[in-house]
Regions:
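A surface-exposed beta-strand-loop module
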Residues: 52, 92-172
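N-terminal signal peptide c-region/cleavage motif recognized by signal peptidases
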Residues: 12-14
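Short, hydrophobic/aromatic-enriched beta-strand segments in well-ordered soluble domains
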Residues: 47-49, 66, 147-161, 211-219, ...
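N-terminal, polar/Ser/Thr-rich
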Residues: 17-44, 171
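Glycine/proline-rich low-complexity spacer/linker segments in large multi-domain proteins
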Residues: 76-89, 156-211, 281-282
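Solvent-exposed beta-hairpin/edge-strand motifs
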Residues: 61-124, 179-180, 216, 220-221
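Short beta-strand elements of extracellular/lumenal beta-sandwich folds
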Residues: 41-54
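Hydrophobic helix-coil surface modules that form long, contiguous segments used
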Residues: 186-193, 201-387
Length: 387
């Protein structure tokens, strides 16, 4: 028996080594332009998606997530949420009380919606099959191994009332828009194949790549999001560099241009009453014989003063500044792939208790300072693994 176990152990090591030498993962580049109507809570957009099939497989179909379609009566998320507590899992009931019957009671203007009107691959219109929160694309030509294709999408949607993870008019924080999982997102493909997982409330699996996003929204709204703002001089609201003149274009809307390199997702939040605070952690420091170069680093805080304890958020930035040296000591220096004028940014936008690349959302300001501190120190390290 011992000899058999040793033999199997060596066999397992051999298979593992072989698998590792052939390791691969897909790669994407997203370029999106979105127009948001704050009166109807609807948006339209275009997406150009460069997709690299680095796998050894020929792909005859691709899949996209349409997450907002979960937030309407009769969806899988709605059905599951209304059954919570009735299904036995292990020693207890499967229970998550955050959704319950909130979806089934939504009115049509409160539903979530995500629709891809047209999808082209390399300029040719493709056949689409929508399965609630998953879009299946039947390709007219397969994507060969080690090749690249370009998808062009025209899409539209409606932002649902805040139910979970994403939405509008958060009943707790009062933040107007918390836009996570808001765009048609290509599903992950790995050694196990496609992962077209229907959205019923769990975590999100994505493909690493670059995002270039333009968001056109009412100019009264202040926005924070994944990535680095490319046009701060046209935006202002505290994003402009010291001494820089803000020159906003004419019209009722502003276009926020954000670029995020080497991340697996993109989110943003916006509200006309956001207060924007910044804290410069350091200027760039050149490398020495004993230490690596350090990039310039600024922390950004967006919060909405909705209650008497809103001043707790003002303590977050200095707390984050004190926590960062410990985090960098144990996890490494926070290094973006590229920098922009003003240096890399950590966005901390508070509304929804979620975290995404370069941005985290919370809604704990009504709690004690200690709870805010614990949440902050727990979320900042996420940036080191999400971008």
């Amino acid at each position: 028996m011992i000899r058999l176990l040793i033999t199997l152990g060596f066999m397992g090591y051999t298979f593992f080594a072989v698998a590792q030498t052939g390791a691969w993962q897909q790669r994407v580049n997203y370029k999106m332009e979105v127009d948001m109507n704050v009166n109807t809570n609807r948006f339209t957009g275009t997406q150009r998606l460069d997709y690299w099939n680095n796998s050894p497989d020929t792909l005859r179909r691709v899949f996209f997530h349409l997450y907002f379609n979960a937030f309407r009566p009769g969806s899988m998320m709605d059905t599951r949420s209304r059954r919570q507590g009735t299904i036995q899992v292990g020693r207890g009931a499967d229970w998550d009380g955050r959704v319950k019957d909130r979806i089934v009671n939504l009115k049509p203007e409160e539903y979530g919606e995500q629709t891809v009107r047209v999808l082209k691959m390399n300029g040719r219109v493709q056949q689409l099959k929508e399965h609630e929160t998953i879009l299946e694309v039947v390709l007219d030509n397969p994507i060969l191994p080690k090749s690249k294709v370009v998808f062009d999408l025209q899409f539209e949607g409606q932002v649902p009332l805040q139910i979970r993870r994403s939405g509008r008019d958060n009943p707790s924080s009062k933040v107007r828009y918390s836009m996570s999982q808001w765009y048609p997102k290509i599903c992950a493909y790995d050694e196990d194949g496609w992962h077209p997982t229907p959205y019923v409330g769990r975590e999100f699996y994505g493909v690493w790549g670059n995002f270039d996003v333009k968001i056109n929204i009412d100019k009264r709204y202040i926005l924070g999001g994944t990535g680095y703002l490319q046009n701060p001089q046209q935006i202002g609201y505290g994003y402009e560099l010291p001494g820089q003149t803000v020159n906003r274009p004419a019209g009722d809307k502003l276009t926020w241009h954000l670029v995020a390199p080497q991340v697996h997702d993109f989110m943003w939040a916006a509200d006309p009453e956001y207060i924007h605070r910044t804290l410069k952690i350091r200027d760039s420091i050149p490398a020495t014989k004993t230490s690596p170069a350090l990039p310039a680093l600024t922390l950004h805080l967006l919060y909405k003063p909705t209650n008497e304890k809103a001043e707790n958020w003002e303590k977050i930035l200095p707390d984050a500044a004190r926590a960062l040296p410990f985090i960098e000591k144990h996890f490494g220096i926070y290094l973006p792939v590229i920098g922009t004028e003003g240096g890399p940014v950590l966005d901390i936008g508070f509304s929804n208790d979620t975290r995404y690349p370069k941005m985290s959302e919370e809604e704990h300001a009504q709690q004690s300072v200690e709870i805010c501190q614990r949440m902050m120190t727990g979320k900042v390290p996420d940036y080191f693994f999400a971008n």
